[in-house]
Amino acid sequence: MKALIGIGLCAALLGGCAALPGRDGPRECSQQLGQEQELQMNMVRDMIREGRLHAALANLESMPPGLLDVREERALILRRIGDPRARAEYQALLETCKAPEAHHGLGLLALRNGDSARAVLELREAARLRPTESRFRNDLGVALLKRGDRVGARFEFITALELQQGGKLPATNLLGLLYLQGDREDAQRLIERLQLDARDIRAAEARARSWGAVPTPGAAPASDDPLAELPAEANMHTAMANEAP
């Protein structure tokens, strides 16, 4: 159990599957945004990061609807606000250079709907098409954990962490999994090596609870951080890269 984390984290600290058939898709986008469109798209993405999803969607309506970037952000917004049109938007992107993002979005939709088997298929395909995308690997780990595959989830969290050196999301997910497994020594080693703070530890504790277990008492220092009180549903969403606020 300790070997994987020891080997996997070594490179990160020193330097900082089944697929769906026939959906390789083009690897590059030929469309390019003009300067004004790029500025508007950046504004839309800022609104999304701020949680102003309806405002972002309204701004997208003033842009050419056929642009792939517009279609991708529209699908993301519709998914986040729970609009059923999101599925069709993602499916329409499967044969474009946005196929990795489309499979990722479809996987998160499946996970939200409780279809963890389909979620794993879609997220595996997203990771196959873009294997170095940290958020795809992280979210695949969450889906695998929902399927009860802790070994697979651990592998994906470590991969995501090494791809995004210093990334708090895969780090806290991995720590949460270690708490879930009762791996106190590995958990403490991870905290020390990555210099995780009390807020990170509380987030990991909350995720471990939402994933089905309470962390071993004494495995982490106490804190008054409000993340410790987040409900299970909120923690499942914040464990996924594209769901974090």
Curated annotation (Swiss-Prot):
Per-repeat ranges for TPR: 100-133, 135-167, 169-200
InterPro entries: TPR-like_helical_dom_sf (IPR011990), TPR_rpt (IPR019734), UCP029658_TPR (IPR016931)
Keywords (A to Z) from UniProt: Cell membrane, Lipoprotein, Membrane, Palmitate, Repeat, Signal, TPR repeat
SUPFAM superfamilies: TPR-like
Primary localization class, coarse: membrane
Compartments where found: Cell membrane
Stretch list, region Disordered: 210-245
Lipidation feature positions (S-diacylglycerol cysteine): C17
Any one GO CC term of the record: plasma membrane
Membrane-topology annotation of the record: Lipid-anchor
Lipidation (N-palmitoyl cysteine): C17
Signal peptide extent: 1-16
Repeat recorded as keyword: yes
The protein, known as: TPR repeat-containing protein PA4299
